[in-house]
Curated annotation (Swiss-Prot):
Enzyme Commission identifier(s): 2.5.1.55
Location(s) in or outside the cell: Cytoplasm
The protein, known as: 2-dehydro-3-deoxyphosphooctonate aldolase
Reactions mediated catalytically: D-arabinose 5-phosphate + phosphoenolpyruvate + H2O = 3-deoxy-alpha-D-manno-2-octulosonate-8-phosphate + phosphate
Coiled coil keyword on record: no
GO molecular function terms noted in the UniProt entry: 3-deoxy-8-phosphooctulonate synthase activity
Alphabetized Pfam families for the sequence: DAHP_synth_1
InterPro entries named in the record: Aldolase_TIM (IPR013785), DAHP1/KDSA (IPR006218), KDO8P_synthase (IPR006269)
Protein keywords: Cytoplasm, Lipopolysaccharide biosynthesis, Transferase
Family label: Belongs to the KdsA family.
EC main group: transferase
Gene giving rise to this polypeptide: kdsA
Any GO BP annotation: keto-3-deoxy-D-manno-octulosonic acid biosynthetic process
Native source organism of the sequence: Campylobacter jejuni subsp. jejuni serotype O:2 (strain ATCC 700819 / NCTC 11168)
Chief place where the protein resides: cytoplasm
Length: 271
């Protein structure tokens, strides 16, 4: 049976201690034979609303901490890059390079990521027609010398795309479940359930969010039939230094993932 991809971890590396506490709580996912697990956290949040917002420890220290998670827990790592010159050093630690939604059309960044051996998760911009994500996927595949396109070509060459909501007026996002079907024509699809409930800029200098909608939207995405899920999680989301309002605590995450596995099994049985 095909494994469900699960990407989870704190939004940003706040400290090594916090990262290890979260990784310890997530290790059961890494050991689950039905899950392809990636630990996620960012070394730099380069697009925070305010210049005064916490960004993270930076590239060098952040990669050391992510490598220590890999060594201690045997987890594969996903983290995002914002500049082309980050692709090579980050790929020495990360198994997956994530292209942020705001940067999903940046050719130089996509090409630099494609030149590494890492898998690539391209987050669809909040502004982007879901069918246009195919051009970002093609930039990666063609850089890697792949002329084929479509779901199977992307899957073979380690390219995912992620849905994280679409702009709906100012300070709000909505999820159009049709986009999951459309995007899956071009690559395996990940549903970013926590960023999809974000309310950009709604907290006065930072983004707000409505985490009570995370589980319902994730269940709906599972029913559509996709390849995996992305969740940001924290020991105490209320105290998180980034994106706390849309995160799940660890108990809610575990319950949600169990439900998603059940839904995916039903979908597979009825295909």
């Amino acid at each position: 049976m095909k494994k469900m991809i699960l990407i989870a971890g704190p939004c940003v590396i706040e400290s090594k201690d916090l990262i290890f506490k979260v990784a310890e709580q997530l290790k059961n996912f890494n050991e689950n034979p039905n899950i392809e697990f990636y630990f996620k956290s960012s070394f730099d949040k380069a697009n925070r609303t305010s210049i005064n917002s916490f960004r993270g420890p930076g590239l060098e220290e952040g990669l050391k901490i992510l490598q220590s998670v890999k060594d201690e827990f045997g987890m594969k790592i996903l983290t995002d890059i914002h500049e082309s010159n980050q692709a090579n050093p980050v790929s020495e630690v990360a198994d997956v390079l994530q292209i942020p939604a705001f940067l999903c059309r940046q050719t130089d960044l996509l090409v630099a990521a494609a030149k590494t051996k890492a898998k690539i998760n391209i987050k669809k911009g909040q502004f982007l027609n879901p069918s246009d994500i195919k051009y970002s996927v093609k930039k990666v595949l063609q850089t890697r010398g792949i002329e084929d396109e479509g779901y199977e070509a992307a899957q073979r060459n380690g390219v995912f795309v992620a849905e994280r909501g679409a702009s709906f007026g100012y300070g709000n996002l909505v999820v159009d479940m049709r986009s999951l079907v459309i995007m899956r024509e071009f690559a395996p699809v990940i549903f970013d359930a926590t960023h999809s409930v974000q309310m950009p800029g709604a907290a006065g200098g930072s983004s707000g969010g409505k985490s009570e909608f995370v589980e319902p939207l994730a269940r709906a995405a599972a029913a559509v039939g996709i390849d995996g899920f992305f969740f940001e999680t924290h020991i105490n989301p209320c105290e998180a230094l980034c994106d706390g309002p849309n995160m799940l605590n660890l108990t809610r995450l575990k319950n949600c993932v169990n439900t998603l596995l059940e839904i995916q099994n039903i979908i597979k049985e009825n295909k």
